[in-house]
From Swiss-Prot:
This is UPF0283 membrane protein BSUIS_A1077. The keyword Hydrolase does not apply. Residues 27-36 have a biased composition (Basic and acidic residues). GO terms for cellular component: plasma membrane. Belongs to the UPF0283 family. Pfam families: DUF697 (PF05128). It is a multi-pass membrane protein. Residues 1-36 are annotated as: Disordered. NCBIfam families: hyp_HI0043. Coiled coil: none annotated. It comes from the Bacteria. The lineage of its organism: Bacteria, Pseudomonadati, Pseudomonadota, Alphaproteobacteria, Hyphomicrobiales. The keyword Cell inner membrane applies. It comes from Brucella suis (strain ATCC 23445 / NCTC 10510). The chain crosses the membrane at residues 78-98, 109-129.
Amino acid sequence: MSDKTPRKPTAFRLEQPARVSAASEQEEPRHPRAVKDLEQITPQADVFDLTDDEAAELEILDPAFEAPERKGWSLSRILFGALGILVSFAIGIWTEDLIRALFARADWLGWTALGVAMVALAAFAAIILRELVALRRLASVQHLRKDAADAAERDDMAAARKAVDALRTIAAGIPETAKGRQLLDSLTDDIIDGRDLIRLAETEILRPLDREARTLVLNASKRVSIVTAISTRALVDIGYVIFESARLIRRLSQLYGGRPGTLGFIKLARRVIAHLAVTGTIAMGDSVIQQLVGHGLASRLSAKLGEGVVNGLMTARIGIAAMDVVRPFPFNAEKRPGIGDFIGELARLNSDRNARK
């Protein structure tokens, strides 16, 4: 035990902490005032978005369409024309000899062959007439493009009305343009400038068609990109690109009211190819596009998926060129689509496919 004397019990007063009410903790309400520093949400950067430099370089590879000058008779045209006449004579002589031989054998065989020949001739004449109408329709679209551009440049109201009336005629059978045509009819008398009338007609009538055309081009590019990514043979890739491009050209022409026949489609495809050849798109192939995109998008993808993006871009470029050729009015009020509008979607499509693997 300790030697210390135990202390006596004593009472202690404990100091109670001051109670603070919840109301006292709150600050006095502030007066209403305008908030200047609003909270801003910074969107997350997409790795597949193009930089300004990449978009500018892609636009350089995608110039606007300029109608080629009509050339006179070339040697190739004279050659094929002469061969066509000779083949027609040969078919006619062969048919005549066949009918004469059948008449010599039996009259009913001769009359049957003559009737079949007349039916074939009538069908051939109907096909030629249909093709000529389709060619005339395509030619009228090309003339309308030129007339609309001239009317907008000169601000000629009379020429603008004539061009808009021709556009109404072309779009009369297209249901997507019904609302735009109705609105244009109600506002035509209120517009006094030819340039404004051209821009209004382009906006109200061609905008829904342009939206559908972009969808067609994007879907075709996606299909080509997927087939290229999963295909193991280059011949399959080339064949599918040609097939998809031909179908895209025809569908775009039908969308804008062109409705080309066989000869019309061949002529339309030649114009698209000529446009691509002038801009150098076909010749650049893998070299320029891979140099352009290789340090950006394609470097983030595998080699095979990069080839899919390249082929998809080529298909998109063909679709854009086809839009330039078959569109009744040139792009003025509406923004012309470019390769940059499709490259992000193609890259995301291939990257998602690579991630699923």
